[in-house]
Amino acid sequence: ALDKNAAVLCSDTIPARYAFTNAHLFKGEFEPETVIAVDVAGLQLFGEGNGVPRYSRHVDLCIDHHAGNSGYADFTLLDGTAAAAAELMYRVILEMGVDITPHIADCLYTGVATDTGCFRFSATTANTHLVAAKLIEAGCHVEELNTLLFDTKPRARMEAERIARNHLEYYLDGRCALIYLTRDEIEQTGVDPADLEELTSLPISIEGVKVGLTLRQQPGGSYRISVRTAKGVDACAIARRLGGGGHNRAAGCELLGNLENAKNAILAEVEAELDAPQEDA
């Protein structure tokens, strides 16, 4: 729209279901005039894949909604009250005077809907719904997108979910539920690693559970841990003590060592948080 070349780079492989969002963008290597990071709260979260470190050494602008953003970029557009980074992108596009085409609306709606769990997460605000409404007015294909994003699961993802459910464990008098997948199990199913993000909602959906944990072994052997919590329990505080971060109700960290060590480390922090005086989170 502004006659500029743009490319999207992500350390992880972008899932096939999101291919429509960047199909028209530049492909290949080039020397960017400006590097912009979106929805990345700290340098350690960029990852090492797909040549990302070449570009993340110097970031000109960061657009983010994580209150704990480390301020690594030259300039930062930060709103910790926004439920999704795509809400901020919507504002930026309007300020730039760009017309929101149906394709742009599809991309922004995808960001808003996925970051809010289809508008179910506690961070969702009236403004989130207003932005979604404006995107629908602009021509986004809301029915098709919701079906693609929330009602369609690859078979490999279903197999991974079956295995994870079989590993379901309860701790701390049922206040904490945990599921996990080893690297062998992930490779056995052939599941797209990005589809595993959807597993994080399983343990916290169980009645009576205050903290839901999902552990996924990474190619190097470490365990990526996703923390989801009920109202009044600070997920970010749990993850932060282990070098991670995130939001009040959704956070994560990564731990070296075997499965039992990872379990013990995260459960110790969960117990400490659950036994501490709680405020609404």
Q: What spans do the regions from the language model cover?
A:
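Short, well-ordered beta-strand core segments
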Residues: 35, 60-62, 76-77, 212
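Short beta-strand "acidic-cap" motif of Rossmann-like dinucleotide-binding folds
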Residues: 8, 62-64
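Short alpha-helices
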Residues: 65-131
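Hydrophobic helix-and-loop "lid/oligomerization" segment in the mid-to-C-terminal part
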Residues: 1-13, 17, 31-32, 114-242, ...
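Short amphipathic alpha-helical segments
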Residues: 48-51, 74-75, 239
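Short glycine-rich anion-binding loops that position phosphate/pyrophosphate groups of nucleotides
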Residues: 40-43, 66-68, 183-184, 218
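N-terminal small/polar loop signature for handling phosphorylated ligands or for N-terminal nucleophile
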Residues: 1-56
